[in-house]
């Protein structure tokens, strides 16, 4: 895409209350714009990244045997009263009335809604397991929304739900999603730690949070120093990962963690996903029942699995940035290549830039502006495309272009044909 045809409102500076890199660069690079406290509009480049993460999440959930649905964001308050959560959830849940005076809520989560859906058709143990997921915008009226899209009031989330006959079945579903999450994170270039956690307002008795470790994270994770190495190993099983101690601050037991004090590390992290074994926490009060093999009535056992898609954008920027901008991993970059012509009045350079752009149009952002070379190069560093093609004096003298790796700053000179072949590979 040509920069002149794309809406990329970059900013030179941000306000002094913007303190974390993901907040700063999501604003400066024109990924989002704030409409109100904790509420953001996703602009073209930011939305491209968001959609790419959605696609990766969908592919891995689909391959894990989950089927996509879409539930309403507004839910009847009566469902929440049925589950006994309406009064206990707190002021972060937005409550309202429709024109008929019926009480409604803007769902911060969807356990009640999915239980209502499944109970309407569940009859027999033969109907189970049922594995469903959705990607849906949610709203939680945070008391102090902060750090931009890392902790906004509105956020995009993938939430999945499993319904099984027995505990062994739920654990198979739990393990299935646990593995899928590690595949998702690896495709995004992230290395998370899976930490035992408190279930909080969701409920249930078994829970793990997935944290990306960064100094600016708001969560504290206690973990064996081997945990991060295992998470990096593509061939490590989920059982091996889960067997190494890691726990959130609420779940950490310093007396019984079983880790040598010399091996126990305390890290800051961003929570990007959470999985829960719910048991019959919702199926019992909401009568999600089936008839078992003996004809007896039983409650389905549930699991719940969430991953913060919009928060993942923030986590990725926190991991992949430097002092001048974002350094997108190639798997999720809005464009693979940024094309910069430094000599806009040179006809040969203009023709070469157009030739490269024509060959790489779908995967490239071509800065066709007449801005100064310094402005163009700084803007491309800020936007963070994995590769930069720079056309300037080297082309005039030697008919070669400069190829820059944004991740490490390394540059090399190559012919136009060699460049195109490499970027198309």
From Swiss-Prot:
Swiss-Prot/TrEMBL GO biological process terms: prolyl-tRNA aminoacylation
UniProt enzyme class: ligase
EC number(s) stated in the UniProt entry for this protein: 6.1.1.15
Location in or out of the cell: Cytoplasm
Pfam family, any one: HGTP_anticodon
Keywords, ordered alphabetically: Aminoacyl-tRNA synthetase, ATP-binding, Cytoplasm, Ligase, Nucleotide-binding, Protein biosynthesis
Source species, domain of life: Bacteria
PROSITE patterns linked to this entry: AA_TRNA_LIGASE_II
Keyword Aminoacyl-tRNA synthetase: yes
GO cellular component: cytosol
GO terms, molecular function: ATP binding; proline-tRNA ligase activity
Disulfide bond in keyword set: no
Catalysed reactions, as listed in the record: tRNA(Pro) + L-proline + ATP = L-prolyl-tRNA(Pro) + AMP + diphosphate
Role of this protein: Catalyzes the attachment of proline to tRNA(Pro) in a two-step reaction: proline is first activated by ATP to form Pro-AMP and then transferred to the acceptor end of tRNA(Pro).
Subunit structure: Homodimer.
Family from the record: Belongs to the class-II aminoacyl-tRNA synthetase family. ProS type 2 subfamily.
Protein name as it appears in the record: Proline--tRNA ligase
Organism name: Anaplasma marginale (strain St. Maries)
Chain's gene name: proS
């Amino acid at each position: 895409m040509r920069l002149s045809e794309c809406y990329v409102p970059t900013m030179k500076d941000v306000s002094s209350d913007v303190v974390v890199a993901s907040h700063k660069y999501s604003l400066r690079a024109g990924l989002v714009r704030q409409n109100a406290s904790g509420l953001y509009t996703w602009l073209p480049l930011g939305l491209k990244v968001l959609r790419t993460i959605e696609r990766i999440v969908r592919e891995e959930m689909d391959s894990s045997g989950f089927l996509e649905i879409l539930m309403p964001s507004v839910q009847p308050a009566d469902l929440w009263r049925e589950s006994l959560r309406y009064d206990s959830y707190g002021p972060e849940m937005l409550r309202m009335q429709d024109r008929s005076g019926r009480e409604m809520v803007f769902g911060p989560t969807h356990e009640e809604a999915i239980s209502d859906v499944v109970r309407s058709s569940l009859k027999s143990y033969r109907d189970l397991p049922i594995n469903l997921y959705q990607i849906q915008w949610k709203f939680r009226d945070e008391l102090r929304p902060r750090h931009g899209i890392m902790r906004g009031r509105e956020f995009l989330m993938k939430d999945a739900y499993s319904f099984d006959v027995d505990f062994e079945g739920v654990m198979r579903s739990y393990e299935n999603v646990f593995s899928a999450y590690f595949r998702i994170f690896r495709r995004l270039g992230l290395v998370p730690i899976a930490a035992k956690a408190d279930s909080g307002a969701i409920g249930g008795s078994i829970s793990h949070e997935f944290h990306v470790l960064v100094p600016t994270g708001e969560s504290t994770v206690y973990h064996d120093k081997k945990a991060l190495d295992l998470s990096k190993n593509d061939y490590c099983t989920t059982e091996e990962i889960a067997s190494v101690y890691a726990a959130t601050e609420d779940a950490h037991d310093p007396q019984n963690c079983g880790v040598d004090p010399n091996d126990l590390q305390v890290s800051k992290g961003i929570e990007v996903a959470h999985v829960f074994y719910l048991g019959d926490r919702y199926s019992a009060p909401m009568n999600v029942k089936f008839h078992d093999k003996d004809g007896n009535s039983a409650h389905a056992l549930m699991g719940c699995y969430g991953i913060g898609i919009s928060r993942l954008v923030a986590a990725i920027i926190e991991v992949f940035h430097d002092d001048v901008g974002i350094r997108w991993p190639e798997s999720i970059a809005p464009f693979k290549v940024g094309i910069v012509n430094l000599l806009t009045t040179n006809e040969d350079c203009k023709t070469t830039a157009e030739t490269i752009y024509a060959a790489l149009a779908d995967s490239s952002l071509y800065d066709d502006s007449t801005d100064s070379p310094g402005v163009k190069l700084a803007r491309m560093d800020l936007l963070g495309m994995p590769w930069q093609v720079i056309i300037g004096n080297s082309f005039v003298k030697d008919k070669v272009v400069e190829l820059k790796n944004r991740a490490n700053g390394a540059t090399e000179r190559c012919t136009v044909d060699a460049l195109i072949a490499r970027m198309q590979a």
